[in-house]
Amino acid sequence: VGENWRDVLAMMKQSFDENLLLPENSPLRYIAVGECGLDFYWSREFEREQLLAFEEQVKWSVEYKLPLMIHCRKAQNEMLHILKAYEKELPGGVFHCFTGNQKEAEAFLRFDKFCLGIGGVSTFKSSHLREDLPASVPLNRIVLETDSPYMAPVPYRGQRNESAFIGQVLHTLAESYGISNEEMAEVTNENVCRVFPVYAHFKANCKL
């Protein structure tokens, strides 16, 4: 038993409309659209459906002025093509689990209200992020992620990832940028509060 993807999108759209009726301070209010995006890593069998669904969700982000949480794997050109059509209207968001190179980072950062989400991969011995990020990405364009339960950072690699492991990512990036853990935490917390405006109301408690 399944649902046609168009029907699923229609139900999700209805949910967004209904959510707007909640008080602004309600803990049930949505804070973002996503995780959504494109993933052609395994197959392009449903490429058309993915493209249409992603663009529809980008439109929701614009309509409801909610940031996007974007997943993109082996689909960068297609994703950028869609986003460019709405570039001036996009409220911002996060390119989730970024593991790309300097050129890819620069392509993503053209969307000036977005940040790159950096997770456990940055701690892997084989990762180039420790060199590429300081060379091409300003600190105010980074947020920290775990991608729990996946991608556990060193020294927990191979285990189930936990939110508590975010400190390993923070320490790795602080060393890469040549700043203290405290400075990295402060900047990335500020970035989260900027990208997700709902957190600005809780700024004093916006700590890792």
Can you say where each PLM-predicted feature lies in the sequence?
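Mid-domain alpha/beta scaffold segments of enzyme catalytic cores
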Residues: 1-208
